[in-house]
Amino acid sequence: MMKKPVVIELAVVVLAAVVAGGYWWYQSRQDNGLTLYGNVDIRTVNLSFRVGGRVESLAVDEGDAIKAGQVLGELDHKPYEIALMQAKAGVSVAQAQYDLMLAGYRDEEIAQAAAAVKQAQAAYDYAQNFYNRQQGLWKSRTISANDLENARSSRDQAQATLKSAQDKLRQYRSGNREQDIAQAKASLEQAQAQLAQAELNLQDSTLIAPSDGTLLTRAVEPGTVLNEGGTVFTVSLTRPVWVRAYVDERYLDQAQPGRKVLLYTDGRPDKPYHGQIGFVSPTAEFTPKTVETPDLRTDLVYRLRIVVTDADDALRQGMPVTVQFGNEAGHE
């Protein structure tokens, strides 16, 4: 009879142990959270001159740290300086022609055109009268048909000269045609565009660093003649620092943009970096070999981009990283 209470007490103890163990396991899972594995993104850019030419100088070498806006190299500027001077001269010529078209004709030019009409009119009147007389003489058989034809030709030439002078005077008095003004304006705009291109080409003969980074390779040396777009430097971008990781679909709800995480490296396992998820791929892919584990080889995963908010020089591109989604990280 005494065994029954002992059994009951033993059952209670076992049940309590199971409950306590389950609670500890649950809390442990909650505290540890989701763990992912990834790498610091390798981000490089090839730098080149947008124009071609002979390399005049290079200011940096492999391993140098560079800053955005820093001059990295220069081509021979002389050909582009000459092209710029030619473009400026072209604008001056086009501007002068356009101004003349807008201003029209001066009073002196109009007076000269009127005098030319008067002179041409007198010449025509004389030629017409002479032709009339020659017609009478030809009818009386005093002159030959050839003499009459010469008189007619002189009259016709004088008439054409008079018409040309009259047209010129009419143009001077009415000003330039709108079509001529529009053509002069278009020529000016074309010259201005050529000037802008020449200025840009001269500017692009200097290579400027687009962002901070570290110079990985220097592909050419001074004296090299480059085609436009030929690679001069390869630069590793140091800021911002991104970590690429992959999450299984089962845990996708925990890896939302804006979620804060802790990032551990082998070199400093007790001092994590801090990061924030900036991007989650909308499409799934098979686990890349760089983060492949035996239980994930056939899994479809989603790529994450994590922005490291406190990166330093110890965090190098390509370095393996452990991403911890603990509660502490998620609510910092």
Swiss-Prot record:
It is found in: Periplasm. This is UPF0194 membrane protein YbhG. Gene3D superfamilies: 2.40.30.170, 2.40.50.100, Helix hairpin bin. One of its GO terms (cellular component) is periplasmic space. The keyword Coiled coil applies. Keywords: Coiled coil, Periplasm, Signal. Its main location: periplasm. Belongs to the UPF0194 family. Residues 1-26 form the signal peptide. HAMAP family: UPF0194. It comes from Shigella sonnei (strain Ss046).
